[in-house]
Design a protein with these regions (language model features):
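Divalent-metal coordination cores built from histidine and acidic residues
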Residues: 74-79, 83-90, 96-186, 205-206, ...
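Solvent-exposed loop/turn segments at secondary-structure junctions
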Residues: 58, 78-79, 117-120, 145-148, ...
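Histidine/acidic residue-rich metal-binding segments in metalloenzymes
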Residues: 125, 161-187, 192-291
Length: 291
């Protein structure tokens, strides 16, 4: 059996287990047996059973079924905590079906939205929507830089923001952070973020840092002027102390291929001097901007 088949069956098992547990709240507990359990710690997987009571994992180990307990055999399959989609654009889709079948079928139980400077509502409003109509997954959000610019600058955004406009954006961001936003996201290759000046970003990242948030960025450039774009992100992290993350880091031009080691060395050097920088990747060569 191929690894892909194992993965597909494991994801299906997770989805089936989630569905069964949700529809059987009256039962004392559910026991998943015979699986190879990967607990998320990085340790090798090992055979174990997992007992779930309502919405809580209460035991992992060598367990025997209890009287009246629902038992899900998972012999030969992999059982793991739900996956976190740390860069999700699901907020551009339809939330009408709050059972989130497409995500659960892939084993995803948490999504992080508001990416690339794009969020569609204040964090308090997002929380209100999902409190009123809960979803089958967990959800976290960043505050999009583009959202802030849209609220403050409207259609007149093809320019740097004025000091008064930056102050207004800072106030909106501070309120979002208090409401639970993870921090500030930017999409500096796209409208409207492409028109922002560095001073604007510095002011906003200072606000995010003060509120305990993070900064995540689709940088200004991922090909010809990649180095300057990365320097801008690192400079924001160094000046404000905020954790900074490069979204989907890549060298998107043939002339830069083969220089990844130098880029990683630059990130390591930045971390060595105290900048809290991280980066994420996706496992394919193309991206939305060039498809």
């Amino acid at each position: 059996m191929t690894n892909h088949t194992h993965a597909g069956r494991a994801f299906a098992l997770l989805a089936a287990a989630a569905s069964l547990i949700a529809s059987a709240q009256a039962l004392a507990s559910t026991l998943i047996t015979g699986a190879i359990v990967h607990d998320g710690s990085g340790a090798p997987g090992k055979p174990a059973s997992v007992r779930i009571d309502k919405d809580r994992i209460i035991a992992v180990g060598t367990l025997r079924p209890r009287k009246g307990e629902t038992v899900i055999p998972a012999d030969g399959l992999v059982l793991a905590p739900g996956f976190i989609d740390a860069h999700s654009h699901h907020d551009r889709g339809d939330y009408a079906d709050r059972s989130m079948p497409l995500l659960l079928a892939q084993g995803v139980t948490t999504i992080v939205i508001g990416q690339d400077g794009d969020s569609d509502a204040p964090t308090a409003e997002v929380a209100r929507r999902f409190t009123a109509r809960p979803a089958a997954i967990n959800l976290a959000t960043y505050t999009g830089h583009g959202f802030l610019r849209d609220k403050v600058m409207g259609e007149n955004y093809k320019r740097p923001a004025t000091p008064a406009e930056v102050t207004a954006m800072q106030a909106l961001l501070a309120a979002d952070l208090k409401a639970g936003s993870l921090g500030l996201s930017t999409g500096l290759e796209y409208d409207p973020g492409i028109y922002s000046a560095n001073d604007e970003l510095l002011s906003l990242t200072r606000t995010a840092a003060k509120g305990g948030g993070r900064y995540i960025s689709h940088m200004r450039n991922e090909d010809v002027t990649f180095d300057a774009a990365l320097d801008e992100l690192l400079d924001l992290g160094e000046k404000t102390g905020i954790p900074v993350q490069v979204s989907h880091i890549k060298l998107g031009v043939v002339d830069r291929w083969g220089t990844a080691k130098a880029t990683l060395a630059k990130l390591d050097a930045a971390r060595a001097r105290g900048i809290k920088v991280t980066a994420d990747v996706y496992p394919y060569e193309y991206w939305q901007s060039t498809l």
